[in-house]
Amino acid sequence: YQINTGLDNMVGGTGWSAGTWGRGTWNSSAEVTVETQLRLWSHDNFGEDLLINPRDSGIFYWDKTQGLTTRAVELSAATTGAANGTKTSVPQVVKQILVSDTDRHVIAFGSDGLGANSSATQGDGVQDPLLIRFSSQENAIDWFPTATNTAGDLRLGTGSTFMQAIETKREILVFTDKSLHSMQFIGPPLQFGI
């Protein structure tokens, strides 16, 4: 389905027509500045397919084998390519995604929590701005941690919200509003460390 691409820059309004229609009287200024946030997107390759995330929204999946005329679908609803199979606790609201180059985990920053149990197909829908979740290795749809997969999560200890993640050669730099963390792949049983 189609997703609104959003604004390409921050728009502020202070005069008549700032805010919702009919909010104030004709030719009167607004009491408070109204700002409309730009929409930020993150995306990364998962093999030949594409994972897409509009900030503070869900994760979408585009399957190359379906051709250029086929739109991306929500990862929790995808049924083709690497997204074909049993889905467990797929995040529903995320600030940014990336696929780690070293070990091919899909990582969701500023994510919602796990679903109610291991058979839940979606996360709980309540965004935690400091929660980092990662899928099982080489599997974009298995997010519920079990003894037989490598899915898991981490919570940042400082700051109040996740800002940005940047992947470097051997680590992922994770910025919050107050701190910078180094996230590294350390292998089983924890997978990642901060």
Where are these regions (language model features)?
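Recognizes the extracellular SEMA beta-propeller fold with strongest preference
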Residues: 1-194
